[in-house]
Design a protein with these regions (language model features):
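Extreme N-terminal starter segment of soluble prokaryotic enzymes
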Residues: 1-4
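FMN-binding flavodoxin-like domain, especially the glycine-rich phosphate-binding loop
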Residues: 13-16, 23-34, 46-158
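Conserved SAM/SAH-binding loop
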Residues: 36-39
Protein backbone atom coordinates (compact mmCIF):
# COMPACT_ATOMS: atom_id res chain seq x y z
CA UNK A 1 0.00 0.00 0.00
CA UNK A 2 1.23 3.48 -0.86
CA UNK A 3 0.48 6.04 1.87
CA UNK A 4 0.82 9.75 1.17
CA UNK A 5 0.69 12.26 4.02
CA UNK A 6 0.21 15.92 3.13
CA UNK A 7 0.59 18.26 6.08
CA UNK A 8 1.13 21.87 7.01
CA UNK A 9 3.14 22.79 10.08
CA UNK A 10 3.82 26.17 11.61
CA UNK A 11 6.03 25.23 14.57
CA UNK A 12 7.01 21.65 13.71
CA UNK A 13 4.40 19.86 15.82
CA UNK A 14 2.18 18.73 12.95
CA UNK A 15 5.30 17.71 11.03
CA UNK A 16 6.41 15.52 13.97
CA UNK A 17 3.02 13.80 13.97
CA UNK A 18 3.10 13.35 10.17
CA UNK A 19 6.58 11.83 10.35
CA UNK A 20 5.55 9.48 13.17
CA UNK A 21 2.61 8.30 11.06
CA UNK A 22 4.85 7.82 8.00
CA UNK A 23 7.46 5.93 10.03
CA UNK A 24 4.77 3.62 11.40
CA UNK A 25 3.06 2.77 8.11
CA UNK A 26 6.40 2.15 6.38
CA UNK A 27 6.37 -1.18 8.22
CA UNK A 28 3.42 -2.13 5.98
CA UNK A 29 4.35 -0.48 2.67
CA UNK A 30 5.50 2.74 1.08
CA UNK A 31 4.89 6.02 2.89
CA UNK A 32 5.91 9.60 2.34
CA UNK A 33 5.10 12.82 4.15
CA UNK A 34 5.25 16.14 2.31
CA UNK A 35 4.69 19.70 3.43
CA UNK A 36 1.80 21.30 1.55
CA UNK A 37 2.95 24.02 -0.83
CA UNK A 38 0.30 25.97 -2.77
CA UNK A 39 2.92 26.83 -5.40
CA UNK A 40 3.53 23.15 -6.18
CA UNK A 41 0.39 21.06 -6.77
CA UNK A 42 0.52 17.49 -5.48
CA UNK A 43 -0.47 14.42 -7.44
CA UNK A 44 -2.32 11.56 -5.83
CA UNK A 45 -1.62 9.13 -8.67
CA UNK A 46 -0.57 5.75 -7.30
CA UNK A 47 -1.70 6.67 -3.77
CA UNK A 48 -3.88 4.22 -1.83
CA UNK A 49 -4.14 5.98 1.53
CA UNK A 50 -4.14 9.78 1.77
CA UNK A 51 -3.72 11.43 5.17
CA UNK A 52 -4.16 15.19 5.56
CA UNK A 53 -2.79 17.02 8.59
CA UNK A 54 -2.91 20.63 9.70
CA UNK A 55 -2.42 22.70 12.81
CA UNK A 56 -5.60 24.36 13.99
CA UNK A 57 -5.64 28.10 13.43
CA UNK A 58 -8.81 29.97 14.29
CA UNK A 59 -10.67 26.65 14.65
CA UNK A 60 -9.82 25.67 11.05
CA UNK A 61 -6.98 24.35 8.89
CA UNK A 62 -4.19 26.66 7.77
CA UNK A 63 -4.68 28.70 4.63
CA UNK A 64 -2.28 26.42 2.72
CA UNK A 65 -4.35 23.34 3.60
CA UNK A 66 -7.59 25.15 2.78
CA UNK A 67 -6.07 26.08 -0.58
CA UNK A 68 -5.16 22.45 -1.28
CA UNK A 69 -8.64 21.20 -0.42
CA UNK A 70 -10.25 23.98 -2.40
CA UNK A 71 -8.23 23.20 -5.51
CA UNK A 72 -8.13 19.41 -5.65
CA UNK A 73 -10.83 17.74 -7.71
CA UNK A 74 -13.08 15.10 -6.25
CA UNK A 75 -12.08 12.96 -9.24
CA UNK A 76 -8.45 13.04 -8.07
CA UNK A 77 -9.55 11.64 -4.69
CA UNK A 78 -11.94 9.00 -6.01
CA UNK A 79 -11.09 5.53 -4.78
CA UNK A 80 -8.61 6.69 -2.15
CA UNK A 81 -8.85 5.83 1.50
CA UNK A 82 -8.66 9.23 3.23
CA UNK A 83 -8.14 10.37 6.83
CA UNK A 84 -7.49 13.70 8.59
CA UNK A 85 -5.63 14.81 11.70
CA UNK A 86 -4.75 18.07 13.36
CA UNK A 87 -2.72 19.51 16.18
CA UNK A 88 -4.38 21.82 18.66
CA UNK A 89 -4.79 22.88 22.26
CA UNK A 90 -6.78 20.60 24.52
CA UNK A 91 -9.68 22.29 26.25
CA UNK A 92 -13.41 22.63 26.64
CA UNK A 93 -13.42 26.03 24.98
CA UNK A 94 -12.24 24.60 21.68
CA UNK A 95 -15.46 23.53 19.99
CA UNK A 96 -13.92 22.82 16.61
CA UNK A 97 -10.55 22.15 15.07
CA UNK A 98 -8.91 21.66 11.70
CA UNK A 99 -9.40 17.91 11.16
CA UNK A 100 -13.22 17.81 11.43
CA UNK A 101 -13.42 20.78 9.05
CA UNK A 102 -11.14 19.05 6.54
CA UNK A 103 -13.26 15.89 6.82
CA UNK A 104 -16.42 17.92 6.29
CA UNK A 105 -14.96 19.53 3.19
CA UNK A 106 -14.00 16.11 1.84
CA UNK A 107 -17.56 14.89 2.39
CA UNK A 108 -18.93 17.84 0.39
CA UNK A 109 -16.68 16.60 -2.43
CA UNK A 110 -18.18 13.11 -2.18
CA UNK A 111 -15.18 11.61 -0.36
CA UNK A 112 -15.93 9.87 2.94
CA UNK A 113 -12.98 9.59 5.35
CA UNK A 114 -12.51 6.03 6.54
CA UNK A 115 -12.08 7.01 10.19
CA UNK A 116 -13.09 9.87 12.46
CA UNK A 117 -10.70 12.84 12.42
CA UNK A 118 -8.05 12.75 15.13
CA UNK A 119 -6.51 15.57 17.17
CA UNK A 120 -3.05 15.53 18.71
CA UNK A 121 -2.42 18.02 21.47
CA UNK A 122 0.15 20.71 22.15
CA UNK A 123 0.93 22.32 25.48
CA UNK A 124 -1.92 24.60 26.51
CA UNK A 125 -1.89 28.12 25.17
CA UNK A 126 1.55 27.92 23.58
CA UNK A 127 1.27 28.12 19.81
CA UNK A 128 4.72 26.70 19.33
CA UNK A 129 4.02 23.66 21.50
CA UNK A 130 5.63 21.41 22.41
CA UNK A 131 3.44 18.39 21.83
CA UNK A 132 2.09 16.91 25.03
CA UNK A 133 3.96 13.87 26.32
CA UNK A 134 2.88 10.68 24.57
CA UNK A 135 1.35 12.32 21.48
CA UNK A 136 3.97 11.00 19.06
CA UNK A 137 3.40 7.49 20.40
CA UNK A 138 -0.37 8.00 20.16
CA UNK A 139 0.10 9.05 16.52
CA UNK A 140 1.91 5.77 15.83
CA UNK A 141 -0.94 3.82 17.43
CA UNK A 142 -3.49 5.80 15.38
CA UNK A 143 -1.48 5.09 12.22
CA UNK A 144 -1.57 1.33 12.83
CA UNK A 145 -5.32 1.45 13.45
CA UNK A 146 -5.80 3.61 10.36
CA UNK A 147 -3.77 1.25 8.19
CA UNK A 148 -5.81 -1.75 9.38
CA UNK A 149 -9.05 0.14 8.69
CA UNK A 150 -7.82 1.12 5.21
CA UNK A 151 -7.05 -2.50 4.35
CA UNK A 152 -10.45 -3.66 5.59
CA UNK A 153 -12.44 -0.95 3.82
CA UNK A 154 -10.48 -0.98 0.56
CA UNK A 155 -9.92 -4.62 -0.47
CA UNK A 156 -7.63 -3.60 -3.36
CA UNK A 157 -5.09 -2.46 -0.75
CA UNK A 158 -4.52 -5.87 0.75
Amino acid sequence: MNTFIVYDSQFGNTERIAQAIADTVRAFGQASAVHVDPAHPVSFQGVDLLILGSPTQGFRPTLAMQFLLGNVSSQALRGLAVACFDTRFRGRLWKSSAAPRMARQLRTMGVEPIIQPESFFVKAMKKEGPLLAGEVERAATWARMLFTKAQASHPAMR
